[in-house]
Amino acid sequence: MLLWLAQYFQDELGPLRVFNFITFRAVFATLTALVIGLVTGPAVIRMLTRLKVGQAVRTDGPQTHLIKSGTPTMGGVLILVSIGISTLLWTDLSNRFIWVVLIVTLGFGAVGWVDDYRKVVYKDPKGMASREKYMWQSIIGLFAAIYLAFSVSAPSNSQFLDLFIAWVQSGFSMDLPPKADLIVPFFKTISYPLGVWGFIALTYFVIVGTSNAVNLTDGLDGLAIMPTVMVGTALGLFAYLTGSANYSKYLFIPHIPGAGELIIFCGAMAGAGLAFLWFNAHPAQVFMGDVGALALGGALGTIAVIVRQEVVLFIMGGIFVVETLSVMLQVAYFKYTKMRTGIGKRILLMAPLHHHFEQKGWKETQVVVRFWIITMMLVLFGLSTLKLR
């Protein structure tokens, strides 16, 4: 919105031309979201406390967590409000990628809000039924996947529609341009054509999978939010480079016109995340809840698809991946052993993985900081794929 105003008055006020620089707006989007979060955070926490939206803690979990019972949850609302206001203020509102990321973020946030509401009202840690949750996530994820399959390949909305019509007229068998291929990191000439159906399937699993992975990771004070900030910031850099014709050509990455504007959203997400961490650091004054975790994960997945860095997201978000795999393996092994022997056995002391380390004697803060360090290393490794080709 501010960009439009600046462009309208820039002939009379020359210094307003600085708003045309994406990097300038990204910095101030970060600061704006940070300030909004820090200023409104105490009021939001007081409101959540007054509404008695306290977190119901698992009784079969680490005993040290029982003291957290009653801590306000649904703090992800603070993150989403900060991101939304900052993004709308500083971004180019005509950019189609900004809107699809916002819609996915708010859509997954709405699913998480309903889940949190049921947990709070019914005092049930399980919240929304898994089948119902996945249904709504799938609807949003498929919407984004179908749109991005053609939007990533088209420089404008009008060409997006032409591409979609051509696909329908081809009997749903048309291939997509090379820029929609799956990129293999470290190899500048190797990529895999996905086709429309392959692109839709991959995008769906990346968005929905990342959303749930971040949600599973959000089990300790500050554990999920800092890796989200680090991965989101790195994706912002990828977005900036992908949106630049010169940088993308030099680095042998696809040039996606308009993708650079996503650095504004990533900056806002980083600022909002740091503001939330101020209140979520141990001992947490507020929890993110599903409303925040599902939304942030969905945003990360969507941005990674747009900038064609799905594999790099898998690398940088390694903590999210391992946490998810720990749950899947734990459940699968328990069911398998129960079917074979009648007694279910576990691979880990407790899943997700962060609880396993707690049960082994690690303090909560040790688990959190060590996972942060691992994420920082993985993010740097992911960024190295830009040049090591």
UniProtKB/Swiss-Prot annotation:
GO terms for cellular component: plasma membrane. Pathway: Cell wall biogenesis; peptidoglycan biosynthesis. Its main location: membrane. The chain crosses the membrane at residues 21-41, 70-90, 97-117, 134-154, 189-209, 222-242, 259-279, 286-306, 311-331, 366-386. It is found in: Cell inner membrane. It comes from the Bacteria. Keywords: Cell cycle, Cell division, Cell inner membrane, Cell membrane, Cell shape, Cell wall biogenesis/degradation, Magnesium, Membrane, Metal-binding, Peptidoglycan synthesis, Transferase, Transmembrane, Transmembrane helix. Its EC number is 2.7.8.13. One of its GO terms (molecular function) is UDP-N-acetylmuramoyl-L-alanyl-D-glutamyl-meso-2,6-diaminopimelyl-D-alanyl-D-alanine:undecaprenyl-phosphate transferase activity. It is a multi-pass membrane protein. It catalyses: UDP-N-acetyl-alpha-D-muramoyl-L-alanyl-gamma-D-glutamyl-meso-2,6-diaminopimeloyl-D-alanyl-D-alanine + di-trans,octa-cis-undecaprenyl phosphate = di-trans,octa-cis-undecaprenyl diphospho-N-acetyl-alpha-D-muramoyl-L-alanyl-D-glutamyl-meso-2,6-diaminopimeloyl-D-alanyl-D-alanine + UMP. One of its GO terms (biological process) is peptidoglycan biosynthetic process. Pfam families: Glycos_transf_4, MraY_sig1. Its cofactor is Mg(2+). InterPro entries: Glycosyl_transferase_4, PNAcMuramoyl-5peptid_Trfase, PNAcMuramoyl-5peptid_Trfase_CS. Catalyzes the initial step of the lipid cycle reactions in the biosynthesis of the cell wall peptidoglycan: transfers peptidoglycan precursor phospho-MurNAc-pentapeptide from UDP-MurNAc-pentapeptide onto the lipid carrier undecaprenyl phosphate, yielding undecaprenyl-pyrophosphoryl-MurNAc-pentapeptide, known as lipid I. Belongs to the glycosyltransferase 4 family. MraY subfamily. This is Phospho-N-acetylmuramoyl-pentapeptide-transferase. It comes from Janthinobacterium sp. (strain Marseille). The lineage of its organism: Bacteria, Pseudomonadati, Pseudomonadota, Betaproteobacteria, Burkholderiales.
